[in-house]
Amino acid sequence: KLIVLIGCGSFIMCDELNRQWPDIPMILCGERDYTGPKETMIREHALPRTERIPISDLQKKYNLTLMQSSVYLNENLQLMKQLIPKMDKVMYIGDETYICQQNDYDLSEIIREKYPELDYQFLSAKDIRTDSLFNILNHVNPHTTGVIFSSWLYKSSPHDNIMRSNSHRVISTAPIPLFSLRAIGIEEEGGIVGGYIYNKEKYNARLLETIHKILDGTPARNIPLYYPDDGAPVFNYKSLLQRDLNPKLCPKGTIFYNMPPTFWEKYEYVIISITAAIITLLFFFQYLRLQSLSRIKRLQQQQLDSNLKYRNL
């Protein structure tokens, strides 16, 4: 048996799962390497530093390991400042889920400590209706404001316990560029232009490798916590242009989706075919030239032999 928990909010289930199946191996997949008091997590409040419990401490009690799907908050802010040189304000679009509340808490803290020149605003689905969000975004100056989009889950009424998503509508109709902390939505042309994210293919491969190790008998607690070290700027080239952002401002090493092919990529096969044809023709003409020279040489030799023959007479 093996349990994979997805999302930081699910980490509070470790105690109950361990009680149900003692020492069952667990893999925690989430954006943070800590959890907190169950009561705080259930209320979906952000965890201040004083309440955070490192996952490494849980390994002493539970048979688990961590696969952190890192969110690079500081790197994304640096990236936004690079693409929006006149940026003086950051907006974060999220909802009342725990991870959005935690991102809001951490973003406000980072901006206060490292970017005091920036204003910050959290737009939450808990407090703002979708139509009101569009009205706000329509009045945003994209040359001075950077917007990070996370998710847009909401309740249709205060008594509704079901969270509904309107993320697709927000992304597809947003009139401004939306930066993201995750890879979702970047490959498609639209509102999400990109962000600083980890390599999801490598992450998935490492997750499968970890699963196989545990199923082969390695205790989960003996597997080191995994932190991606391959974060990089990832952007949709066409989305950048559609949202009036200059791809040339992206840092070196940026990964682009939908980037137009270079001259070589576009005409590679044509160039190779023409080059091959020219080389073939050159070889053919060289062959004809050698044949002609050989024929002339034979005629000259015949003429020389004839002259010698007549001279001997």
Regions found by a protein language model. Give the residues of each.
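Hydrophobic alpha-helical segments within soluble ligand-binding/sensing domains
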Residues: 36, 47-54, 65-87, 199-216
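Alpha-helical transmembrane signal-anchor helices
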Residues: 257-303, 308-310
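Hinge/cleft segment of the Venus flytrap/periplasmic-binding protein
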Residues: 216-272
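Structural motif
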Residues: 5-9, 29-32, 68-71, 93-97, ...
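Glycine-rich, charge-decorated loop segments at or immediately adjacent to ligand/cofactor-binding or catalytic sites
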Residues: 35-49, 133, 184-195, 242
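An alpha-beta-alpha
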Residues: 56-111, 225-236
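Membrane-proximal low-complexity regions enriched in glycine and acidic/polar residues
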Residues: 66, 116-218
